[in-house]
């Protein structure tokens, strides 16, 4: 009997991002609203690792993870700079982040799911583009009817924005009103989200090509 080597698919590289021109997306979930620890994908190994305990009272209000086969590089940074009219904006050199809305209770990450993009948050984090795509779980009984972020309940968007604006802030920074490192400079709809995803996908293909040439 032949022995086959063990192989675990890498969540960043192995899944196909989309098969229908960014209408439906494969999403890798890292953390859930039930996690008191922030997990993130270790890009080198493909394993889910502990990044840090969630600070203070902040808990992510939705499923949160990344889009496989995306990378926020040159094209993503340049586009963010164009849209915000700021110079020197770079991609954060990470996969594109995604927030997935669902009414179901999903208690653990390290899973793949299919979701539809409805929009996104244009975020600048310490001078780098760090957009968050907002998507809805396919066939969700509540959120699946949402086609665009303009249809999303304002309270849901408020919770998501509040999390990203405060999850790195200390009480001292908030009390003193110190300048925020994270800025939400815009909210956009489905078509713009698909553009952002496409650019991150193109950045990924360039990044993988450059990495292969170096190796």
UniProtKB/Swiss-Prot annotation:
User: Which compartments is it annotated to reside in?
Assistant: Cytoplasm
Give the enzyme's EC designation.
3.6.1.1
Q: Which domain of life is it from?
A: Bacteria
Quaternary structure and interacting proteins, as annotated: Homohexamer.
So what family is this one in? Belongs to the PPase family.
What is the stated purpose of this protein? Answer: Catalyzes the hydrolysis of inorganic pyrophosphate (PPi) forming two phosphate ions.
Entry-linked PANTHER family: INORGANIC PYROPHOSPHATASE (PTHR10286)
Q: Which NCBIfam families match?
A: PRK00642.1
Top-rank EC class of the record's enzyme: hydrolase
State the GO CC annotations. Answer: cytoplasm
| Keywords, ordered alphabetically | Cytoplasm, Hydrolase, Magnesium, Metal-binding
| Entry binding sites for Mg(2+) 2 | 97
Quote the record's binding site residues for substrate. 38, 52, 64, 167
Binding-site positions, Mg(2+) 1: 92, 97, 130
State one Pfam family annotation.
Answer: Pyrophosphatase
- Which catalytic reaction applies to this protein? diphosphate + H2O = 2 phosphate + H(+)
A single GO molecular-function term is: magnesium ion binding
Descriptive protein name:
Inorganic pyrophosphatase
> What cofactor(s) does the depicted protein rely on?
Mg(2+)
Which HAMAP family does the entry mention?
Inorganic_PPase
Give the GO terms filed under biological process for this record: phosphate-containing compound metabolic process
Which species is listed as the source?
Answer: Chlamydia pneumoniae
Predominant subcellular localization, coarse grouping: cytoplasm
